[in-house]
A protein has these predicted regions:
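Beta1-alpha1 glycine-rich phosphate/pyrophosphate-binding loop at the start
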Residues: 5-15, 20-104, 206-207, 273-279
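Short beta-strand to alpha-helix junction loop
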Residues: 74-93, 105, 182, 254-263, ...
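Alpha/beta-hydrolase fold catalytic core
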Residues: 261-334
C-alpha cells in the first residue's frame, strides 16, 4: 500500500477510520470531485469491525444483499448471510476498484482533535506522527471499535488464557481444553457452535437469554451469481425485497404492536423445535419483550448447547479466581481458557477520541450524560465535523449499511458546501439540534428499547443515545439533503489564504 505526505497545508477532509464507513465516505467524496482527502487508520489494514472480528463462526446476521452499498453491489456473495472473511474481501475490493488505497495512512492513531477558529480548520494530533490540518473531519471510527471486557471482580487474577471475541487468538489451540464462554449475545451464539466441535468441554455463562430467531443460510447458486452480474437490476430488485421485508419487521421490534406478539411466537416456536428439555427451555426463554435487546439470528446455537460437552450456567458470576470462575452459589468452575463474548465499549456517553470545539468546548463533557447530535451527524459548536453512526442512528431491524450510506451521502453534500462554497465553517444551530433531540427522546419513550430491560442501547440512567426510533425509510429520508437553514454558515475570510495540503503518493 502506498504512502503519502499530508504535512504541508490543509486537507479538504480527514476521515478517521478505514472501515466500512471510512472507505465508503472516501469513495463518495472522490465521486464528487473532492480528492484532497486522507484516511487515518490506527490499525495495519482496512476493514474495521470485520478486520478485528475473526472469531470462529463470525458472520453477519443481515442478508449480504442488504449488508453492502447500493453503489457497489457484489453479485458474487456465496451465501445469504456472509462470513467475516467474505465481507472483508468486499471492503478490500472497494479499495482496489475505486483506487482509495493511496489515501489511507495506516498506523495513524488519532489522539486529539481541536478546532482552530481563526484558521477555520481542525488540528488533528496523531500518536508519534506529524499533526494534520483539515477543513473538515469525518469521524468514521464507528461504535464497535473498542473491545469491552466485563467489570467482573478478580478478572486480573485469572491465570489461564483470556480471549476477547473481537481480539481472537488464532494461535491458541482449543483442542482438548476446558473452555468458558462469558456472554450470550450476537458473537457468543456464533462462537459456541464452533467451540463445541473442538474443545473438551464448553460452559456458557448466561446472564439473560435473548430472543432468538432462525437463520436460514442458503448457498447462492452459480446461475444466480451469473444473473446478478449480467443483469444488475435483478440484484437491485433482490436487495429491495430484502429491504422491505426487514422494514416490515420494525412494526414488531421497534414498537410494541400485535406484530411483536408474532415475533415472540416465532422465537418460542424456534426454541420448542430445537430444545426438547423443559428445564433448558425455561432457562433460554426471555423475560422481556422482543426487540428490547438485539434479536439473535441463529439456527446453530440451541443445538450446540445440547451437545454432551456443553453446559449452560445461569448462576451469576461472583468473581474470577486464579483457576476459573466462581458463581454466587459458591461453585468454582475451572478452565484452561475463558472467552469473553461481551461486546464493545459503545460510546453513548463521551467520545473515543478527545474533541475540542469552539470556545474550548469538550465533546466528551457535553456527552457525559448521553450523546446528542443533529440527525446523528453534526453537533453544534463543532463546525465542519461529521459523524457516521453517531448518536441515535442504530437500526433495530435493518442493515447498518442502509443507514450508513444515507449518512455518507449527506456528509459528502455538507463537505461539498464547505469546500466548493469556500466556507470558513458550517455549524448546526443549537436550537435546531435541541429540537431534534427532544423529538427523538419523545419517540424513543414509546419504543420497546425503553420498555424496561437492561441493554447496551441505554446508559446507566436509562438514556437512549443509540437507536433511531423509526423505520429505515424515515431515517434515510431525513438525510436526503442538507437543509442549509439549519446551519450557521460563515464564508472564509479572503485575507486568510490557505495553501491546500500536498497529498503525494509514494511508491
Amino acid at each position: 500500500m502506498s504512502e503519502f505526505d499530508v504535512r504541508e497545508g490543509v486537507l479538504d477532509a480527514v476521515i478517521v477510520g478505514a472501515g466500512f464507513a471510512g472507505i465508503g465516505t472516501a469513495i463518495r467524496l472522490r465521486n464528487s470531485g473532492i480528492e484532497n482527502v486522507a484516511i487515518l487508520e490506527r490499525g495495519s489494514a482496512v476493514g474495521g469491525t470485520w478486520r478485528d472480528n475473526t472469531y470462529p463462526g463470525a458472520a453477519c446476521d443481515i442478508p449480504s444483499r442488504l449488508y453492502s452499498y447500493s453503489f457497489t453491489p457484489n453479485p458474487h456473495w456465496s451465501h445469504t448471510y456472509s462470513g467475516s472473511g467474505e465481507i472483508l474481501d468486499y471492503i478490500h475490493t472497494m479499495v482496489r476498484e475505486f483506487d482509495i488505497g493511496s489515501r489511507i495512512r495506516f498506523g495513524h492513531n488519532v489522539v486529539d482533535i481541536i478546532w482552530n477558529e481563526g484558521a477555520g480548520h481542525w488540528h488533528v494530533s496523531i500518536d508519534g506522527r506529524p499533526d494534520v490540518r483539515a477543513r473538515t473531519v469525518v469521524m468514521a471510527s464507528g461504535p464497535l471499535a473498542n473491545a469491552s471486557l466485563p467489570n467482573i471482580r478478580g478478572i486480573d487474577t485469572y491465570e489461564g488464557h483470556k480471549i476477547h471475541s473481537a481480539r481472537w487468538d488464532h494461535d491458541y489451540d482449543f483442542e482438548g481444553k476446558k473452555v468458558a464462554v462469558v456472554g450470550t449475545g450476537a458473537s457468543a451464539v456464533q462462537i459456541v457452535p464452533e467451540l463445541v466441535k473442538i474443545a473438551d468441554t464448553v460452559k456458557v455463562f448466561q446472564r439473560t437469554p435473548g430472543w432468538t430467531l432462525p437463520r436460514i443460510n442458503r448457498k447462492v447458486q452459480a446461475g444466480t451469481k451469473r444473473r446478478y452480474a449480467r443483469y444488475p437490476q435483478t440484484q437491485t430488485l433482490a436487495r429491495s425485497l430484502w429491504f422491505w421485508g426487514h422494514e416490515s419487521v420494525a412494526l414488531g421490534v421497534v414498537w410494541k404492536t400485535p406484530l411483536t406478539r408474532i415475533v415472540e411466537l416465532v422465537g418460542r416456536a424456534h426454541l420448542r423445535q430445537q430444545v426438547r428439555d423443559p428445564w433448558l427451555r425455561r432457562q433460554l426463554t426471555p423475560r422481556f419483550r422482543a426487540g428490547c435487546k438485539r434479536l439473535l439470528m441463529t439456527s446453530d446455537y440451541y443445538p450446540a448447547l445440547q451437545k454432551p460437552n456443553c453446559t449452560l450456567v445461569t448462576w451469576p458470576i461472583a468473581t474470577l479466581s486464579p483457576k476459573g470462575i466462581r458463581t454466587v452459589e459458591g461453585v468454582e468452575h475451572q478452565f484452561d481458557a475463558i472467552v469473553f463474548a461481551t461486546g464493545f465499549d459503545v460510546s453513548n456517553t463521551g467520545t473515543p477520541i478527545p474533541i475540542t470545539g469552539r470556545d474550548s468546548r469538550v465533546l466528551a463533557d457535553e456527552w457525559s450524560a448521553g450523546a446528542k447530535a443533529y440527525k446523528s451527524i453534526a453537533v453544534s459548536g463543532y463546525p465542519n465535523m461529521f459523524f457516521t453512526f453517531g448518536p441515535n442512528s442504530g437500526p433495530g431491524h435493518s442493515s447498518a449499511l442502509v443507514y450508513m450510506e444515507a449518512q455518507i451521502d449527506y456528509i459528502v453534500e455538507a463537505i461539498s458546501l464547505v469546500v466548493e462554497g469556500d466556507l470558513h465553517s458550517a455549524d448546526v444551530r443549537q436550537d435546531v439540534q435541541d429540537a431534534y433531540n427532544e423529538d427523538m427522546q419523545r419517540k424513543l419513550a414509546k419504543t420497546t428499547w425503553n420498555s424496561g430491560c437492561s441493554s447496551w442501547y441505554l446508559t446507566e440512567d436509562g438514556f437512549n443515545a443509540t437507536m433511531f426510533p423509526g423505520f429505515a425509510t424515515q431515517y434515510v429520508n431525513q438525510l436526503r439533503g442538507v437543509e442549509q437553514g439549519d446551519f450557521t454558515m460563515v464564508p472564509r475570510r479572503v485575507d486568510l489564504p490557505q495553501e491546500p495540503a500536498q497529498v503525494v503518493a509514494h511508491s
